[in-house]
Curated annotation (Swiss-Prot):
Organism: Vibrio vulnificus (strain CMCP6)
EC number(s) stated in the UniProt entry for this protein: 2.8.1.4
Entry GO MF terms: ATP binding; CCA tRNA nucleotidyltransferase activity; tRNA binding; tRNA-uracil-4 sulfurtransferase activity
InterPro entries in the record: Rhodanese-like_dom, Rhodanese-like_dom_sf, Rossmann-like_a/b/a_fold, ThiI_AANH, ThiI_fer, ThiI_N, THII_Thiazole_biosynth_dom, THUMP_dom
A biological-process GO annotation: thiamine biosynthetic process
Protein name according to UniProt: tRNA sulfurtransferase
Domain (Rhodanese) ranges: 404-482
THUMP domain span: 61-165
Family in the record: Belongs to the ThiI family.
HAMAP family linked: ThiI (MF_00021)
GO cellular component: cytosol
Gene3D superfamilies xref list: 3.30.2130.30, HUPs (3.40.50.620), Rhodanese-like domain (3.40.250.10)
Length: 482
């Protein structure tokens, strides 16, 4: 098993020193993730590309998933690599691998070459293509729009026969840009905006303003953990939770109805700015889009921005909602967002779309800012990798089992893609598949006289979901950890 990783082209327009630094960071990121998830997989930096190889196909799917979801990679080539003696040896190797593919088909050979050789790329294409045409009678050469394109690369003394192309994520390697703090709510917008900055090379930390209790926080942690685990697990990332209910209560009591929405957003930004300052983070990220709600008009956004000296980034500012949802679907956060509880304790009957500075300041003069400072001081921060540990500590009554008791049902709560890649089958045991994001709505329809053992690959999601179900009054759930 061998993959050739092509870095994003923007990296190569940088200066030599920056290019080397970026590719070195990319190599390190790939190595960290692969070492955490697989065994005996080697990573090598070859200046203009990175090679990832192993002696077996045991971790093929895991490695391919890692490479196609790691920022900074333009494409991933799956190759068969070998040495060669001369042109004829190359032809014979290509014939052995491609004979069956081109039978009764039209084909063309496309070659790239780098290094010192006694032949050109065009001569290589002609020699190999002509040989294949003579050796496979049912095949014929067609230079434009053929059925099969045989792609080969000769690099110094190595022949790479390209078996498949896989599109990479693009962007810059994680850690090449400065850290950001994302104001995450778990909905469509904040998940996509966080992803876009991860893709661009920033370590994105997460700040959650809790307005809806533990169930909402569990859901948001799932989204943040998913984004980190899938796209940025080479980095150490913080998750900060701020209990904002006291702030909301103060706004409801002290602020005039029409100004509540903008004042709440200003409080969010003040608090996020304090958190960012504590961790020396220069910019905040939000999922706001222009005109989406009353607090997101240009006038109101300007009044919101002035309360902090941190740069506020809004990557979705001109996006339509359907565009945002499409990206959420592509990156895997749509199902989280669809089932995320929407909490907002500040709902104005007639929210202002064009706030006035003097009126906002007059309303905020009634607000007790000691409350805001207190909730920020009491904010809970954790390493995002410790979400599994926290869920276990928060719910010690959630039992974990290795053996399956009689009549128990195993609930495979992995996503459909994960379940398809590695179906869970246990002899003599009933296994049901309900994705984690449907548990909240479908678990109550199950036979509650039975015990259900929740299963996921790493035990993180199963613990969080077990905690959530127990909070909803279901005591017939355990975590299955074979």
């Amino acid at each position: 098993m061998k993959f050739i990783v092509k870095p994003h082209p923007e990296i190569f327009v940088k200066s030599e020193s920056v290019r080397k630094r970026f590719t070195k960071i990319l190599e390190s990121n790939i190595r960290i993730i692969i070492q955490n998830r697989t065994e005996s997989v080697a990573v090598f930096n070859r200046r203009d590309h990175i090679e990832v190889s192993a002696n077996s196909h045991q971790y093929y799917q895991q490695v391919l998933e890692i490479l196609t979801t790691t920022p900074g990679i333009q494409q991933v080539l799956e190759v068969k690599q070998s040495g060669f003696k001369d042109l004829h040896d190359i032809y014979e190797q290509v014939l052995e691998l491609s004979r069956e593919r081109i039978e009764n088909k039209t084909f063309v050979v496309r070659a790239k070459r780098r290094g010192k050789h006694d032949f050109t790329s065009i001569e290589l294409e002609r020699y190999v293509g002509g040989g294949l045409n003579q050796s496979v009678e049912s095949a014929s050469v067609k230079l434009h729009n053929p059925d099969i394109t045989i792609k080969i690369e000769v690099v110094d003394d190595k022949l790479n026969q390209i078996l498949a192309h896989h599109k990479g994520l693009g962007g810059f390697p994680l850690g090449t840009q400065e850290d950001l703090l994302s104001l995450i709510s778990g909905g469509f917008d904040s998940g996509v905006s966080s992803y876009l900055h991860i893709k661009r090379g920033s370590k994105v930390h997460y700040c959650f303003f809790n307005l809806g209790g533990p169930a909402h926080e569990i859901g948001v942690k799932q989204v943040a953990h998913f984004l980190w685990n899938k796209y940025g697990s080479s980095a150490k990332v913080r998750f900060i939770s701020v209990d904002f209910e006291p702030v909301v209560a103060e706004i409801l009591e002290k602020v005039e109805d029409g100004q509540m929405g903008v004042v709440l957003k200003r409080m969010f930004m003040r608090a996020a700015g304090m958190v960012a300052e504590k961790f020396d983070i220069q910019a905040l990220v939000t999922g706001e889009a222009l005109g989406q709600v009353s607090s997101q008009t240009l006038t109101n956004l300007r009044h919101i921005d002035v309360v902090t000296d941190r740069l506020i980034l809004r990557p979705l500012i001109n996006w339509d909602k359907d565009e945002i949802i499409k990206v959420a679907r592509d990156i895997g956060t749509e199902d989280f967002a669809k089932t995320m509880p929407e909490y907002c304790g500040v709902i104005s009957k007639k929210p202002t779309v064009k706030a006035v500075k003097e009126k906002l300041e007059a309303e905020e003069a009634n607000f007790n800012f000691d409350i805001l400072e207190q909730v920020v001081r009491n904010a809970r921060q954790m390493d995002i990798r410790d979400i599994a540990k926290e869920s276990a500590q928060a719910a010690p009554e959630v039992e974990q089992v290795q053996a399956i008791e009689e009549h128990a049902v195993v609930l495979d709560i992995r996503s459909p893609d994960e379940e398809d890649d590695s179906p869970l089958e246990i002899d003599g045991v009933e296994v049901k598949h309900i994705p984690f994001y449907k548990l909240s709505t479908q678990f109550g329809d199950l036979d509650q006289s039975k015990t259900y053992l929740l299963y996921c690959a790493r035990g993180v999601m199963s613990r969080l979901q077990a905690l959530y179900l127990q909070e909803q009054g279901f005591n017939n759930v355990k975590v299955y950890r074979p």
